[in-house]
Amino acid sequence: MKNTTILSAILLMTSIVFVSCQGSPAREEKLPIMSWYSIPAEDATLERYQELADCGFNINFSHLGSLEDLRTSLDLAQQVGVKVMATCRELETSPDSVVALVKDHPALYGYFLRDEPACPSFPYLAEWARKIEYADGGEHPLYLNLLPNFVDTAVLTCNYRESVRRFIAEVKLPMVSFDYYPVTFGGISSDNWYDNMQVIHDESEAAGLPFWAFALSTAHDPYPLPTMASLRLELYTALAYGAQGLQYFTYWNPGTEVWNFHEAPINQNKERSEAYYLVQQMNRELQARAFVFVGSKVVSISHVGKTIFRGCKAMEELPAHVVSLETGDDGAVVSLLEKDGWYYLVLVSRTLERPTDLKVAFDTRVHMIGPDGKAVRLPKGENALSIGEGDVAIFRYRK
């Protein structure tokens, strides 16, 4: 596999634009944002693909049945500036011939193998992956999505961390992805979710691989309708832990009645729902701040607050250049990122019930990165701030 080529493919969404603002980063970058369960073959029109692009997605992942459907998707996506995560029945039965037909298409992002596999399937997936890689010449990444950590070990056949480690070692894909939707009608499943995030961060970092994570955009049992607060909580937490790609489940409303799927961004009536506009707003905000996260390295990740959840690390020392940091009992995720000579202190709310009060002081000049990506200089001394429900505060300063 061409490792440098694959890495650039994973960050294919990145565009470099020089800016002239004093003290601003040297370039603006784009996060990969993928629509899971996207436009079906029977609704594949240029208008629908433009609608997807207008919502802020730059990778389309439709569950397509045939190679013909896939080629149609690629052609439409190209016209609206979107890439495609490729899947079809023939990719598994005849990988050589499928890859030969699509590998040079400008809209191809990568190839999808399987959703939520258990350990016994890893040898087969590895064999299949090598066939695709060989046919593709290592030009595009291969992708699958892992189970969350609350799945019974009888399904995984080993403990969760070991299953992630085995996936990385045995299947040998250039990225790690997992899904966990922490917001239910009963609240936030904080213990499991943060522990899951920590495991994925640890194992992907140890292997030198990027990881991708999810937000839930479609209500179904036992998950409520998304809100801006729930989307921010899920996505900014993932980015604070080092995620390099983001995904929404789902974009198009699934037809099955088993899980009571409803009010997807494109809902059961094939119309835009309120979720469409929430996701659109969220994606604009994410891309405005993408320069903070794309290619950043996690220096440290910890938690403050009355409760330190399972698998999380309590903050034992202040991040670099931070003189004091206080929150209320609700606490926050405390992540220090570094990139291009900058530190980014990322503080993410852990509650959807109320704003989080924050007091923070630094020993150096600091700017706060707003939702529009603009940097606003903080006054010297202690700053008393409020982080909205599920929201984030981002501080930038020189190393």
Model-derived features with residue positions:
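Core hydrophobic alpha-helical transmembrane segments of single-pass membrane proteins
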Residues: 11-13
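C-terminal motif of bacterial Sec signal peptides marking the signal peptidase cleavage site
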Residues: 19-20
